[in-house]
Amino acid sequence: MMTTPELSCDVLIIGSGAAGLSLALRLAEKHKVIVLSKGPVSEGSTFYAQGGIAAVFDETDSIASHVEDTLIAGAGICDRHAVEFVASNARTCVQWLIDQGVLFDTHVQPNGKESYHLTREGGHSHRRILHAADATGKEVETTLVSRAQNHPNIQVLERSNAVDLIISDKIGLPGPRRVVGAWIWNRNKEWVETCHAKSVVLATGGASKVYQYTTNPDISSGDGIAMAWRAGCRVANLEFNQFHPTALYHPQARNFLLTEALRGEGAYLKRPDGSRFMPDVDERGELAPRDIVARAIDHEMKRLGADCMFLDISHKPDDFVRQHFPMIYAKLLDLGMDLTKEPIPIVPAAHYTCGGVVVDDYGRTDVDGLYAIGEVSYTGLHGANRMASNSLLECLVYGWSAAMDIDRRMPSVHSVDVLPAWDESRVENADERVVIQHNWHELRLLMWDYVGIVRTTKRLERALRRITMLQQEIDEYYANFRVSNNLLELRNLVQVAELIVRCAMMRKESRGLHFTLDYPQQLAESGPSILSPLTPHINR
């Protein structure tokens, strides 16, 4: 049944992190914008980002150096054009953030001049990380949220999940294939609403919730990647899942990460006996790229049969540690640990999805009118491994470029007066929610065990067989019962799990974040692993 949509806007932005909100604020002067947030508006990966944002502000640094560092960290398969595009626009986009009211830390130089305090993290050859103490994401997110909520042209819908995108040819509309809106699950009212939009932007973040152990908030369930795939978009490089080397090992704080900046300021990684191991692994020691550090920690844990390794900055002055890492210091103190006095137990945990929906310089996907920006996208910036503090930067740069393109094409986009209403005539209320919980746990455990930091062909094949069975069960459940938040996330996550495994099976080498015992060497030449819904098993 066709009906007038309950919601209508010029631009629907699905996601309320740095990518989505920066885009919304750039567009709102001329266009009506709706921003969807799955939970409270600030509950996303941006809020929890500790490290900072990479940009060239130091006169001894250069854009060329930022580019080169990113290419090296990406292990040979970054898109050089994308890297240069982001690095060359970094300072302008960070300045826009400052103009919005974001306060980065400053310090007084020996010559008496005040400047931004720049820190250094793994993979960077210079100090180029702007930060707000050790809670940069919180400063960025709260500033952008405040501005968005007070803008008359931005409507923020909290506790609202996108169920699926509405694509023109799938609902019988004539003309070129394009996105015309989305169905939205209103968690407060517990029903599905129809939203018309001239442009739709996926800013949903990554898919690290596919793993049992993650530093991400619960909402990181790969929604945008799954929706884009179902809409007909290509995805790429999903085998490259970044495991943050230093998540806190503590039963009461499983999602808490210890920022890379700790190692940037001199923290050591140690075995339980107090000895260091990174100097034996890489000449850069603790400042090696994350894939190398995470694999080294994983190797030591397995070699020693240890539950964790340790991060130690107790050799630095107490005041220095408390001043630079106040949030981490306070959190650990609440848990009975003193960062200034003792080594802190850590383990690797799923942290960032380096692949995603294939886009161009403007965040445009394969479907007309559909954009993807931030962690959900594959721009080519990160290659086989994301360099620290390039993620928030990517959000800002593509939020800027997508805004330009959306604004440019808006006058030529025709509105759609009626869209199909969500049909619940053949479904019933769920009676066995334990099925969802069981599938949740099984999926995340098998991904951790078989598609984790170290992989083999047999593990990947085993994972794919079980994922295929889970997909059948979940699709049947989705077809017969009313939607719920857990069901929507599970449906999306099992789809993304399949895509991760298929990308991993395509790559017959070890490179960056993808390490397989069956192909331990790196090929002389390689490129992205690209999957298309039209030919799902195409090789790169």
Swiss-Prot record:
GO cellular component: cytoplasm
Cofactor binding annotation: Binds 1 FAD per subunit.
InterPro entries: FAD-dep_OxRdtase_2_FAD-bd, FAD/NAD-bd_sf, Fum_R/Succ_DH_flav-like_C_sf, Fum_Rdtase/Succ_DH_flav-like_C, NadB, Succ_DH/fumarate_Rdtase_cat_sf
Pathway given in the UniProt record: Cofactor biosynthesis; NAD(+) biosynthesis; iminoaspartate from L-aspartate (oxidase route): step 1/1
One term of GO molecular function: nucleotide binding
Binding site for FAD: 16-19, 38, 45-52, 223, 375, 391-392
Name of the protein this chain belongs to: L-aspartate oxidase
Gene: nadB
